[in-house]
Amino acid sequence: MIAHLRGELVTAGADWVVIDVAGVGYRCLVPASTRSRLPAQGAAVQLYTYLQVREDALTLYGFLTQAEYDLFELLLRVDGVGPKVALAVLSTTDPAAFRRAVAFEDLDAICRVPGIGRKTAQRLVLELKDKIGAVPAGGGGVPDGLPVAVAPAGDAWAEASEALIALGYSRGEAAAALARVRAEAGEAPSVETLVRLALKQLYRG
């Protein structure tokens, strides 16, 4: 079992990274929450990792925080929930907010995650409510939807997110699309560039 990787960030795509550890490059699939907070290429980085073993493939998933890793692993224990849905959860919300949604049986909030319908949301609540532990501090009420993963810093990113929301996309969809275009957008993109690139991602589904 590969528990974590610590090394140099070699390259990164929309939902994956390659980390060089002692001359060996490890390719990890990552959620938007991790992708949007990665350092620059060439910098040192550490990811908590989950290795999925199948007959035809070995797939490594990486997360910046232990909380993200723990939630990913917990989600995979739910019948019918695979890595794709688990990554979608972490790409559109933070672990504490998702745990609150489960604790308060907020099905509407859970269903806002791409790939999760009503039946899956009900199954998540049924199977996870007794496993998530105490509701995190500050979770005194039912959340008004799930807060999205932190977007890259900069006013242009925030303005682009609001522009996408104004076009009818959810806050989670906007955050996930913007996270996927970070590498392509460059260091100081304009709002127009960010919106255009994000819309391409959203149109692709």
UniProtKB/Swiss-Prot annotation:
SMART domains: HhH1. GO terms for biological process: DNA recombination; DNA repair. GO terms for molecular function: ATP binding; four-way junction DNA binding; four-way junction helicase activity. Residues 1-64 are annotated as: Domain I. Gene3D superfamilies: 5' to 3' exonuclease, C-terminal subdomain, DNA helicase RuvA subunit, C-terminal domain, Nucleic acid-binding proteins. Keywords: Cytoplasm, DNA damage, DNA recombination, DNA repair, DNA-binding. It is found in: Cytoplasm. SUPFAM superfamilies: DNA helicase RuvA subunit, C-terminal domain, Nucleic acid-binding proteins, RuvA domain 2-like. It holds the Pfam family RuvA_N. Residues 153-205 are annotated as: Domain III. GO terms for cellular component: cytoplasm; Holliday junction helicase complex; Holliday junction resolvase complex. It comes from the Bacteria. Homotetramer. Forms an RuvA(8)-RuvB(12)-Holliday junction (HJ) complex. HJ DNA is sandwiched between 2 RuvA tetramers; dsDNA enters through RuvA and exits via RuvB. An RuvB hexamer assembles on each DNA strand where it exits the tetramer. Each RuvB hexamer is contacted by two RuvA subunits (via domain III) on 2 adjacent RuvB subunits; this complex drives branch migration. In the full resolvosome a probable DNA-RuvA(4)-RuvB(12)-RuvC(2) complex forms which resolves the HJ. This is Holliday junction branch migration complex subunit RuvA. It comes from Symbiobacterium thermophilum (strain DSM 24528 / JCM 14929 / IAM 14863 / T). The gene is ruvA.
